[in-house]
Amino acid sequence: MAANCTSSWSLGESCNSPGSEPPQSMPSPATQLGNHDSDPETCHVNFRMFSCPKESDPIQALRKLTELCHLWLRPDLHTKEQILDMLVMEQFMISMPQELQVLVMMNGVQSCKDLEDLLRNNRRPKKWSVVSFLGKEYLMQESDVEMAEAPASVRDDPRHVSSQRTSSVNQMCPEEGQASQELQTLPRVPALFRRQEEDFLLPETTVMKGDPKALRPKPTLEKDLEEDREENPGLTSPEPQLPNSPTGVVGAKEGKEPQKRASVENVDADTPSACVVEREASTHSGSRGDALNLRGLKRSKPDATSISQEEPQGEATPVGNRESPGQAEINPVHSPGPAGPVSHPSGQEVKELLPFACEVCGKRFKYRGKLAVHTRSHTGERLFQCNLCGKRFMQRIGLQFHQRTHTGERPYTCDICQKQFTQKSYLKCHKRSHTGEKPFECKDCKKVFTYKANLKEHQRIHSGEKPHKCSKCPRAFGRPATLRRHQKTHREATSQ
């Protein structure tokens, strides 16, 4: 029926049905255009949405369809090739995804040849995305707000994630204001990481690359905003280290008035319950290997037999230099100073509870597998490879996040604009574009930023730091994007 109608208006006559009278002659295009104020696109919609009532005259319906088709395709103005392109383009727009529909509309494509050239160039619509709202999909223009992301190396050590499950600050000393403010902004990590930590490879399956003693840990820096957005979110913050000073204060007797102190509560995946570690805000200088890792230690009540009688009260004892190797508990001693009391385990106790130590930085772990995962942060070893693109990761959880870029899975949805994200940290950063929150402030000029990566980049202006060095010349840069642009000059010079 549609084919017959298409041929009928091109010949200037309508289709006849058996036994019916011949229809009247078609009105001229000028008469049709004068009777209809609608544009061709409106006639196109009316033509496709036309419905004939049951009791209406089919001949009149046929005339109406022919008229609408004539007003849409305009055979008096267009050639047969142009009309064919219009029909093919219409079916293309119906059957193709919404992204390609936007691409055609944005570029004003009018012919199949132009559309083929557009598709060969692999062009894609910019600043548009498909969002779901109330069960329906809509095209939405994206905002210009950029989102920050930390590099994949921030989760090289699973204890960096598990130790910061919950963080709170109870009281704050005047000299501890800086450290306490940092503790208040520690991010909460989803329980997914605790479940994934059991999947790390055992040490027997880990192959060490290079000499660990000759390597040093790489500094954890925020990635530039123009880096890949779909790897891993920044989830770590400086962990509490034990002061290595002979005048360190340990323990506090019950019944005495507590002094102001900063209390940090860390939940570790290695232990079934949380432990509270009270530390001094100002740490003294010392080798990193001597700084003991307090995570995973459970506080236990001191036993009468475990308290050394040889050390007088009021005299502080350096941690790790106990003369009695069998001493398993903490001696309650005091030292004068402004800092509050801090609980310190003995060196022997740390070695028993955390028997596996890193040869590079001295950090200790309860399980050998955890040490093997941590060592990858020094060696740069990446055991988990994506089977689609070949990209490698240090941990399985990083690979799982990356695979969402291939599958298109976006489980986290903004409840304001319904935009979806692959990771919860991305959603948290995105919500700041709605609230206008700028939680990161520069200490030098008091300028505030929405994302921490922006603050890190801004602080390099004050410090003059240029951590990104070119491997082919002595120049260094403060931003990775600037380094990439500089490296292009070397490649262009080599190609010429």
Swiss-Prot record:
Residues 1-38, 149-188, 203-347 are annotated as: Disordered. SMART domains: SCAN, ZnF_C2H2. May be involved in transcriptional regulation. Its main location: nucleus. A zinc finger (C2H2-type) spans 356-378, 384-406, 412-434, 440-462, 468-490. The gene is ZSCAN5C. Residues 1-19, 161-171, 234-247 have a biased composition (Polar residues). InterPro entries: SCAN_dom, SCAN_sf, Zinc_finger, Znf_C2H2_sf, Znf_C2H2_type. It comes from the Eukaryota. This is Zinc finger and SCAN domain-containing protein 5C. It comes from Homo sapiens (Human). Residues 210-223, 253-263 have a biased composition (Basic and acidic residues). Residues 44-126 form the SCAN box domain. One of its GO terms (cellular component) is nucleus.
